[in-house]
């Protein structure tokens, strides 16, 4: 277990996460600590466990073992008969999840709601923010991600992928989270739209947002993160400062990955 003093400095402490599907162990003890303002990029080949690890942080995937501490508060778990973790207090998890906003690879906007409805839905129904206040804030966040006021009444199907992902980022910001989790936020986008989303993410990093980003964008990992983790076959093979990890890789696997042979 983590010492209290250690967790207080941390916005997020993830300890020794294990996850398996049947006999296939996809995470073999992965840990991460994020202090306020950290931008941590998680890189690795397909199947290395990056997205599974990210989804275990907010229990979208249930880890088989490990501990997650958000802003000094450990997610309460118990062990079931099979020796796997179960959530012990669903109300607590719900509350902790409001501190962890997730931005998905495929945007996950509600198709039947227009842009502003997508952004205000959770603040109104989960946080209890009055509608007018939620809408005012939503407009601020939409402006922050570079979307014009005329977009707010449009439906997701009428927007480009880049616009949809920026709405998804505005929706995450509207929850005023402690930590933002990004699961390959640009990999479903056409190449010419990637830049507009990365620009928004860079702006958030410069504002001091705490961000955990699973990404294939090495430029972002190098220039925006202050820490990079390289996952290989469910373990952290190498981690550290971007300049060290990406410019002077020590492990053969990371050298191969960066040269493109594992991509």
Question: What residue spans do the PLM features occupy?
Answer:
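Conserved ABC ATPase "signature" region
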Residues: 73-78, 82-87, 131-150
